[in-house]
Amino acid sequence: MTISFIIPIFNSELYLKKCVESIFNSSLSEIDIEVFLVDDSSTDDSVKVAKELSQQYNSIEVIEQNNQSNRGASVARNLGLKEATGDYIWFMDSDDYLDSTLVGQIIGDIKKYNCPDIFAIQLKLIDGKITRIECSQPNVKHNIVLKGRDAILSGYQPSSVCAIICKREFLDNNKLRFYEGISHEDVEFSMRAVALAHSVYFSDYLAYIYTMHAGSVSKSRTAERQYFYIIGDMYVALSLQKFVKTIDDVELQNHILRWSNNILLNLSLSVKRSNNPLMDKNFKKKVFLDMKNHGVFPLKGPFTSWKIWLLSKLVNLSCIHL
């Protein structure tokens, strides 16, 4: 079994080597690994580091984009998917790393459970002195193969794409690719992938170490960048509402539709309540105007509960004159 690791790189010269070596320090043979380092117009020495690593490990391919501006992780991941030939795809971020001691066990379990479409792991987030577990999916049954729709109906919450190891054939057969040009593309991709999966397995492996650095996207925002980050939720909801029209499962359709409407409500609340100096009155007006122009404000529902429905009405009344 071969694994394709797809790693977008953007100004990560300080962390890339640790990320890559966490793969090769595992028990996997190098012939069972291919690593795609996809540069996204880095302005530091990330490409130099990537090329040095490719000289050290024959299974690394460095992909450089012929553009002058940062296009985002979605574009880089889609480029990696075009080149990948492995049986499974494992997405990583270039400033994160794996617990090398667990990688071989994970691949062993993928084989043991008849190669499910998706094998999910958990993430350890390290932010300074704070450490917490993410993507644990407490509402979903673990250590048993499920249908994707059953995982969603039981309470699956899409999050980082680094938490789902996907069969390449499954991704290709369903034409699953990342929505380019938005934030929160992981959430949008993960929900569609799990919804379409015939078999998913949620493990207890805490194998992926997600680190927050001073240069992380979420910590280095201008007003323009903040707007891009915030409005991404709207595009995620719109995409999922379009997606549900393509599936025949009515119960699953309704669940995802309600869940996407909850995203829009949370977006509205976060903007309305924000004291962030970047999000002034004009910023907030722009968000709600954008939502209105896309037909999702005032909020309409359906929602996941009557309490949330009632809250949406209050939000509509309080925000409509912003």
Residue ranges and their predicted role:
Residues 271-322:
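Membrane-interface aromatic/basic loop that binds lipid-linked glycans or pyrophosphate carriers
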Residues 74, 94-201, 211-227:
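Donor-binding/catalytic cores of nucleotide-activated saccharide
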Residues 66-84:
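Glycine-rich, basic loop-to-helix element that forms the pyrophosphate-binding segment
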Residues 2-4, 22, 34, 188:
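Cell-envelope/extracellular polymer assembly enzymes that use nucleotide-activated donors
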Residues 12-26:
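Short, well-formed alpha-helical segments that are part of the catalytic scaffolds
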Residues 32-41, 61-66, 94:
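Short beta-strand/loop segment that forms part of the nucleotide-sugar
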Residues 22, 39-49, 67-69, 98:
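A conserved acidic beta->alpha catalytic loop
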Residues 89:
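Short aromatic/hydrophobic "clamp" motif used to bind/position activated sugar donors
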